[in-house]
């Protein structure tokens, strides 16, 4: 490493001195000249795989477009060196396992670096001079000979690809290769090319001199855009006829180091756990280079670390693999609590570290390891806990842990060192990391008044290094509270007969108070007595019966009756205890056997015996065997007997019975001779054999057919009545109109188009006012006696137009008070105004000129408002 740095420093220093010496001698650049190597790649072939020191491989040509002699070269492989004239020599013994490639670089007069690629190939049939001749002499490609006739055609010639360096400096167009045909010895031949870079995109990159066959490149090539061009060359005669088969030409673009590497990410992030051993891989960085990394070193990258921040505890904690970019730990002392993060400045350089470079950033997070133990703070606690409380929070214990919060290395795990009886439990609060101490069982003040607990704490993750365990002491004092009394035993069972008399003692309950140091009085109560059969003495707990016990009650299940008992003390906070009293009710023969069913039907002809099932609410021995007999004279017409099993009875008539209902008195007795009289109702029907259903008697004693005939007759009469009513409703009634229309005899209206002659509001005819008062229609009534009243006095029309207002007011008042004026609902006659008038619809009201007879009796149905009108038009009919 030191020798390489020293060599690079000496190269740079020598280059600087040379530049200072040659700057005064720099002449003007030759027109079109650009500094650089004559070729982007040199291939030196050797005839052996082992090269001795001092062996000459070839020569490179470099021109910086000045008159000075160039003599400083930088060789990318330390096994070779370059003389000032460009001769490449073997610096030390070299053994070739495969083709060796390296780069030779130099600087022009302006300080710009130029590079060329060198390839050393082991080929016995080629010499270094032959390989070098490719760069100094342009090749000539000749069309292969064509064969005619029936001879089998040999395989086509394989034309070696033409190599052209990218970014060449010209001048352009620049000759690449000459295409020749052997036919040009006899005839004039013209050449052309087709394909990619010629007539296909990218067009115009290559062209050919159509007479000489020189193939030219017109501009610099870019390998990153197109790394290969495939073209076809053509040869034709003067008349355009092909003289050769098309020949394929491949042009490979040789890469130059013209692209800087690029990191695949702006910032690389990784992590490593504190306390890990050296050699642990942390992360990897990666970069890309668009240059060739297969046939040259231009795209071969080398990685390095330029800077570490912070440089603690040592400057070089990390290293990077030059080829893969994997960053590993090489030092010790990672401590997240001191330095939780490291930032590395990394560099990627092509040409295996001798070319273009780019810098990037890698951030390494130091993850937590459990290298810090949790510590109680404080380490002693006291707590007061009421007795009998389950799940009561006794105390919260706090710890401090320097590890990263939220990680298993920080999460605390608490344990109770001695937990006799399992009275306590401790859990961890996930948010605060506190230990929550609770009661798992109820504490009893009378048994133990204080507990001293030792609690330890660790982490969910084991310690990465040996660490001491922290311990806390919790002193728990039990607080005495009023506890509820309890029954002894909690469940009492007693056998009691169902005929228990009222006030008879059943049991004396016993309860105890756990508060021994408190003298308290106990009281007894009944909590739940569904049937209200029991009574308890409040002071001594003696339970007595009310005389109502019944084993056959719905409250008794499986001969047991359950009662909830309560006991209380007289403390400040009353405590209540609960007990259970279970009574096993003993049976008493208080129920006689009864038959079922109690209603049945039977035929009067050859009846089958009726089977009646016998049941008894009591239990053996107060049930079967049963005895059956008939009483109250039922044995005269009926017979009863038990079946073979003795659980049912057969009831049958002793003689033929008439239709009707019969009451049978059945007397049943159980094994203890407890009798039970039951009345069974039998209905005898007119049938034979087994009676399934008798026809019920109808009301009034009629048979069913008679009732059906009566109902049919009533229904027929009802239908006939409805049809008659419908016929009357559908009878057509011709209604006459109230008034017939008369012929249109109204006067026509004329329109006058007068112009001038004064204002229109003063052009009126006063005679029309007088005419309107005198032309009232005469209305004659013959239905009432007329009342003679003086006629009103109307003022005549004044001659002076100025008095027309008084004339109107006075005559209007006289008309309002005229007793002879017709009512508002009187028939009015309107003047004829000609056909088409809007008032034509009122013409039907004028019926005075009609001689037709009309029936106006329906006016009487219109109410009191039309009564007078009905009297006027209906009076003639009454007189007739």
Curated annotation (Swiss-Prot):
Domain of life the protein comes from: Eukaryota
Q: Which GO terms describe its cellular component?
A: adherens junction; catenin complex; cytoplasm
Q: Which Gene3D superfamilies match?
A: Cadherins, TCF3-CBD (Catenin binding domain)
Ranges facing Extracellular side: 156-703
Query: Where is the protein situated, by its record's location annotation?
Result: Cell membrane
One of this protein's Pfam families, by short name?
Cadherin_pro
A GO MF label: cadherin binding
Q: How does it sit in the membrane?
A: Single-pass type I membrane protein
Report the record's disulfide bonds. Answer: 603-687, 685-694
Span-the-membrane segments of this chain are: 704-728
> Where's the Cadherin domain?
156-263, 264-376, 377-487, 488-593, 594-704
Propeptide residue range(s): 29-155
Q: What is known of its domains?
A: Three calcium ions are usually bound at the interface of each cadherin domain.
Question: Subunit details for this protein?
Answer: Interacts with CTNNB1.
Name of the protein this chain belongs to: EP-cadherin
């Amino acid at each position: 490493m030191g020798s390489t740095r020293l060599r690079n420093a000496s190269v740079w220093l020598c280059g600087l001195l040379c530049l200072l010496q040659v700057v005064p001698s720099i002449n003007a650049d030759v027109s079109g000249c650009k500094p650089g190597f004559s070729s982007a790649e040199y291939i030196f072939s050797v005839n052996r795989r082992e090269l001795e020191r001092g062996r000459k491989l070839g020569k490179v040509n470099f021109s910086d477009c000045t008159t000075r002699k160039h003599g400083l070269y930088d060789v990318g492989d330390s096994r070779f060196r370059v003389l000032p004239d460009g001769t490449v020599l073997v610096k030390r013994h070299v053994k070739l396992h495969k083709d060796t490639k390296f780069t030779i670089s130099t600087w022009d007069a302006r300080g710009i670096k130029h590079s060329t690629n060198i390839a050393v190939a082991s080929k016995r049939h080629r010499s270094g001079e032959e390989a070098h001749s490719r760069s100094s002499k342009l090749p000539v490609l000749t069309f292969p000979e064509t064969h005619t006739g029936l001879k089998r055609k040999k395989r086509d010639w394989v034309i070696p690809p033409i190599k052209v360096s990218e970014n060449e400096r010209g001048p352009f167009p620049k000759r690449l290769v000459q295409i020749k045909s052997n036919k040009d010895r006899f005839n004039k031949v013209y050449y052309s090319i087709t394909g990619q870079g010629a007539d296909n995109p990218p067009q115009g990159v290559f062209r050919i001199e159509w007479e000489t066959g020189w193939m030219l490149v017109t501009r610099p090539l870019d390998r990153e855009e197109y790394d290969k061009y495939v073209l076809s060359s053509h040869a034709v005669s003067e008349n355009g006829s092909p003289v050769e088969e098309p020949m394929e030409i491949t042009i490979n673009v040789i890469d130059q180091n013209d692209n800087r590497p690029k990191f695949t990410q702006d910032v690389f992030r990784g992590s490593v756990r504190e306390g890990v051993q050296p050699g642990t891989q942390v992360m990897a960085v990666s970069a890309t280079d668009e240059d060739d990394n297969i046939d040259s070193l231009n795209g071969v990258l080398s990685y390095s670390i330029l800077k570490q921040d912070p440089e603690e505890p040592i400057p070089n904690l990390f290293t990077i693999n030059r080829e893969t970019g994997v960053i590993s730990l090489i030092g010790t002392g990672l401590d997240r609590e001191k330095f939780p993060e490291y930032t590395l400045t990394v560099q990627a350089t092509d040409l295996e570290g001798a070319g273009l470079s780019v810098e990037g950033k890698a951030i390494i997070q130091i993850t937590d390891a459990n290298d810090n133990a949790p510590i109680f703070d404080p380490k002693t606690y006291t707590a007061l806990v009421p007795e009998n409380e389950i799940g009561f929070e006794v105390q919260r214990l706090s710890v401090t842990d320097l590890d990263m919060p939220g990680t298993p290395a920080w999460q605390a795990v608490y344990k109770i060192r001695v937990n006799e009886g399992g009275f306590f439990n401790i859990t961890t609060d996930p948010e605060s990391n506190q230990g929550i101490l609770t009661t798992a069982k109820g504490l009893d003040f009378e048994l133990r008044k204080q507990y001293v607990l030792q609690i330890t704490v660790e982490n969910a993750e084991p310690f990465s290094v040996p660490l001491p365990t922290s311990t806390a002491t919790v002193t728990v004092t039990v607080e005495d509270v009023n506890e509820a009394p309890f029954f002894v035993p909690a469940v009492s069972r007693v056998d009691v007969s169902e005929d228990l008399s009222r006030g008879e003692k059943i049991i004396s309950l016993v309860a105890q108070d756990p508060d021994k140091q408190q003298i308290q009085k106990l009281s007894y109560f009944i909590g739940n007595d569904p049937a209200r059969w029991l009574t308890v003495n409040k002071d001594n707990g003696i339970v007595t019966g009310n005389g109502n016990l019944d084993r056959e009650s719905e409250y008794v299940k499986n001969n047991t009756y359950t009662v909830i008992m309560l006991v209380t003390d007289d403390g400040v906070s009353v405590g209540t205890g609960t007990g259970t009293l279970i009574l096993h009710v003993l049976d008493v023969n208080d129920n006689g056997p009864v038959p079922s069913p109690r209603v049945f039907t039977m035929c009067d002809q050859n009846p089958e015996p009726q089977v009646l099932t016998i049941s008894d609410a009591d239990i053996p021995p107060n049930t079967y065997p049963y005895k059956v007999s008939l009483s109250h004279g039922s044995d005269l017409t009926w017979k009863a007997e038990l079946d073979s099993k003795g659980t049912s009875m057969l009831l049958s008539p002793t003689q033929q019975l008439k239709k009707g209902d019969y009451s049978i008195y059945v007397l049943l007795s159980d094994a203890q001779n407890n009798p039970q009289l039951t009345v069974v109702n039998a209905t005898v029907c007119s049938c034979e054999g087994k009676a399934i259903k008798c026809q019920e008697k109808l009301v009034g004693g009629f048979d069913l057919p008679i009732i059906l005939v009566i109902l049919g007759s009533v229904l027929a009469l009802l239908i006939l009545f409805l049809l008659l009513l419908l016929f009357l409703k559908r009878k057509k009634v011709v209604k006459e109109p109230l008034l017939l229309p008369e012929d249109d005899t109204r006067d026509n209206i004329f329109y006058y188009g007068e112009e001038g002659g004064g204002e229109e509001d003063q052009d009126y005819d006063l005679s029309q006012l007088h005419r309107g008062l005198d032309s009232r229609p005469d209305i004659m009534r013959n239905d009432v006696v007329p009342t003679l009243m003086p006629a009103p006095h109307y003022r005549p029309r004044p001659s002076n137009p100025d008095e027309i207002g008084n004339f109107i007011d006075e005559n209007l008042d006289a008309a309002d008070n005229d007793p002879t004026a017709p009512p508002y609902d009187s028939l009015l006659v309107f003047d004829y105004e000609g056909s088409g008038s809007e008032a034509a619809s009122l013409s039907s009201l004028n019926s005075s000129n009609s001689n037709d007879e009309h029936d106006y009796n329906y006016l009487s149905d219109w109410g009191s408002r039309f009564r007078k009108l009905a009297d006027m038009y209906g009076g003639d009919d009454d007189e007739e």
